[in-house]
Amino acid sequence: MSILKSFIEVSEDSHFPIQNLPYGVFKPTLNDQARIGVAIGDFVCDLSVLADLKLFDGKLKDTKVFHQENLNSFMSLGKELWSEARKTIQNLLSSETSTIRDNKEYREKIFHSISSVTMLLPARIGDYTDFYASKEHATNVGIMFRGKENALMPNWVHLPVGYHGRSSSIVVSGTPLKRPWGQTKSDEPDSLPTFNPCRLLDFELEMGALIGGESTKLGEPISIESAKDHIFGLVLLNDWSARDIQKWEYVPLGPFLAKNFGSTISPWVVTMEALQPFATKPPTQDPQPMKYLQEQGNTTFDIELSVSIKSPKMSKPHKVSTSNLKYMYWTLTQQLAHHTVNGCNMNAGDLLGTGTISGPTEDSYGSMLELSWKGSKVVSLGTETNEERKFIQDGDSVILSGLCKGNGYQIGFGNCEGTILPADKRQ
C-alpha cells in the first residue's frame, strides 16, 4: 500500500507530514489579522485563503471559520465537519492533485514558512481542568510525602482525580514566564511562613485535550461511549508548578498560587483523526471502575513524549526524561465522562490536562520533583557544561516534545517551550 504524499516537500524527520495536518492560529506578520492554518512540512497552509478561493465544498463551501482568531468556531462544528475539512485539505495538498500544485499564484498566497510566522494560542480556553491520572506519578508523589504504605489515596483507583485550574494564565509555546512569589514555610519546628520567590520551581509533562462539538446542556452528562466525539485534538502541556508554595497552601483545597501563575501549551492541535492509527489499549484497571467509566478496546494513544532542559550556558537542550501517553491509568475519555457525570456542561475550547505523565522507570518521570526525588539527588544536564539541577533555575528553558511513529511517516506535536525569568523585585 502506497503512502500518501504531499507535493510540499516534507523531510523524514518532520513532525508535520500530510498524515498529520495539525491546526493552529497564526499571523503571517505582526500587523496581519490572525487566521487558521495547518502545518505541512516546514510551511503553514493558510486555510482562510483556501476558503477565499472557494476550495472547500459541501457544508464548508462558504465557511468563515478559518478567518477567526481562534479555533473555537471550527471546533464547535463537530466531528462530521472536522472530518470533511481534513479530507478536503489532505486532497488539496496531495501530490496527485493539481489544483494548488500547478498554480504558482495560489501557492504564493497559501503557504508561509513556519519560521516566518507568529503562532498564537490555538483556542479561546474558557475552562481548564487538570487531572492526576498517572498511577506512577501519583504513587511516586505519595511515597515521597506519605510513605509506601499510604502512597495512593483510597479514592484514586475508583475515579479520575482532578481540580479546576486557571485558563487566563495559559500561554502559547515560546512565552517566557516570571518566577512566582508566594507564601512558603520551612519544615523547622515553630517556623513561620515567609513571603518570597519560589525556590522549588518545577515542570510537569502533560498533554491537553481540547473539547469540541456543540456545547452540552447543564445537567446532561457525556457518556463514555460518546466522549471521544467531544475531543477535537491534543496539545502538549507544561503545567508549571511551584512546589514549595504548593506544599504550604494545598491543604485542604489543593493547589492554588502554585499552579495559576502560568501553564504552557504547544501551538499545533493534532486531531483525534490523525492520532487514530496510534490508538492502543490503556493499562488494566483494578478494581474495575464503575459502569459509567468502563470502556473497551484501544482507548488511548502511543505518543512518545520527552522533556529537555537548556540552561543559558548551553548551546542545545539536554533530554532529561522520556515517557508515553499510553502509561496513563485514566484515559482522556474517562476523564471527560467523569467530569460531566454530574451534569457539568462543556464548551468548545475547554481544556482538560492529563496530569503529569510518568512512566515505570526513573528516566521516564514527568517532573523534577520525581527526577530529583524531592530534591534528594541531582539531575544531569549533560556533558557540554556539566551542569546539574534539582529544580528549574532562572534562565532555564524547558522543552516538551511528542511524536507518534508510523509506518513510513511520523506524526508530531512540535515543541512546547517555556523559559523562566527571574522573579520581580519586591519589598
UniProtKB/Swiss-Prot annotation:
Biological pathway: Amino-acid degradation; L-phenylalanine degradation; acetoacetate and fumarate from L-phenylalanine: step 6/6
UniProt: Mg(2+) binding residues: D239, K259, S263
Superkingdom classification of source: Eukaryota
Entry's EC annotation: 3.7.1.2
Gene3D superfamilies (UniProt xref): Fumarylacetoacetase, N-terminal domain, Fumarylacetoacetase-like, C-terminal domain
Reactions catalysed according to its record: 4-fumarylacetoacetate + H2O = acetoacetate + fumarate + H(+)
Positions contributing to substrate binding: Y132, R146, Q246, Y250, T356
One GO term (biological process): homogentisate catabolic process
InterPro entries: Fumarylacetoacetase, Fumarylacetoacetase-like_C, Fumarylacetoacetase_C_sf, Fumarylacetoacetase_N, Fumarylacetoacetase_N_sf
Cofactor(s) required, per the database record: Ca(2+); Mg(2+)
Binding-site residues for Ca(2+), renumbered to this chain: D130, E204, E206, D239
Record: active site: H137
GO molecular function (one): fumarylacetoacetase activity
Coiled coil: none
Record carries keyword tRNA processing: no
Family: Belongs to the FAH family.
Name listed for the protein in its UniProt record: Fumarylacetoacetase
Lineage: Eukaryota, Amoebozoa, Evosea, Eumycetozoa, Dictyostelia
